[in-house]
Design a protein with these regions (language model features):
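The feature captures the conserved acid-bearing segment of alpha/beta-hydrolase catalytic domains
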Residues: 169-217, 221
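C-terminal catalytic histidine-bearing segment of alpha/beta-hydrolase fold enzymes
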Residues: 63, 71, 214-262
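N-terminal cap/lid segment of alpha/beta-hydrolase-fold proteins
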Residues: 27-51
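Alpha/beta-hydrolase fold nucleophile elbow
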Residues: 117-128
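Glycine-rich nucleophile elbow surrounding the catalytic serine of serine-hydrolase chemistry
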Residues: 126-136
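Short substrate-entry loop that stabilizes the transition state in hydrolases
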Residues: 54-55, 63-98
Length: 262
């Protein structure tokens, strides 16, 4: 096991060095520096900020049908990186719908991302299905970040009938058995509130796939009831409408929540 970890570390270091050589600009900033790796069969990556003293590590959780590259090369998450954050992602066993193995994947990524980035994990970011994956990691994981940010988050698996293939993927994720109630975030609002995390939801009432009222609307109401620090930003447009992806809102929340504002 130790030999395997050393080998992974050497491979990651070589990749990082090569990417630095390829991407360092005249200013010395590394706008596209990445480290990629493989943790027990799951591809992972981190995007590194242009500083040796990062503000923290943010872990991004992809949605159904996506992978560890989702949003990682776009301007939304890159705004966080340019502000001084390490941004990490994983395959998380693809269509995991927050099952136990995805929580194990999160803990492995946590350790690896901190090692590669030189900062502490402070923020989870969940998109669509990634809302369930990240919130379940928050409840069931050995370690918990102080901050959580969800975009169009799916948090009630019983309401995913309009998401193509979701019912089949959810069944497969839980071995053909009904998902446990303690893996359905809307039903774990009390436990989520007790983590002490600060929550930010971004969702649209016009989302045709993830119903607003029974997902973001309902869980925000329950979190408020249980005394959590939670806010909701309502946007317009369908499920992946650009209005969801405000770089300013993401960066401002991350820094305010983590206490890392300049």
């Amino acid at each position: 096991m130790r030999t395997k970890r050393i080998a992974q570390g050497v491979t990651a270091t070589v990749l990082a060095f090569l990417l630095v050589l390829l991407t360092t600009g005249a200013s010395g900033e590394h706008p596209a520096e990445q480290v990629r790796g493989n943790l027990d069969g799951q591809r992972v990556r981190v995007n590194l900020p242009p500083t040796t003293e990062p503000k923290g590590v943010a872990i991004f959780f992809h949605g159904q049908g996506s992978n560890y590259n989702h949003k990682m090369d776009g301007t939304w998450l890159d705004a966080l990186r340019r502000d001084g954050w390490v941004v990490a992602s994983s395959m998380f066993h693809r269509e995991n719908w927050g099952n136990p193995i995805s929580t194990e994947d999160t803990m492995k990524l946590w350790d690896w991302a901190e090692q590669q980035g030189g900062g502490e994990v402070k923020l989870y970011i969940g998109a669509s299905m990634g809302g369930t994956t990240s919130l379940n990691a928050l409840v069931h994981g050995e370690r918990k970040p102080a901050c959580w940010y969800g975009v169009k988050p799916a948090v009630d698996m019983s309401t995913m009938g309009n998401v193509p293939g979701a019912r089949r993927f959810i069944s497969q994720a839980y071995g053909g058995q009904p998902y446990p109630r303690d893996r359905n975030p809307v039903d774990t609002a009390f436990k989520l509130a007790k983590t002490g995390a600060t929550f930010r939801f971004v969702a649209s009432p016009r989302d045709p796939f993830v119903p607003y009222e029974s997902n973001s609307g309902e869980i925000v109401s329950r979190l408020n009831q249980f005394g959590a620090d939670v806010s909701l930003r309502t946007v317009q447009g369908p499920h992946d409408d650009p209005s969801h992806y405000s770089a300013h809102d993401l960066v401002a929340f991350a820094n305010e929540c983590a206490g890392t504002s300049d």
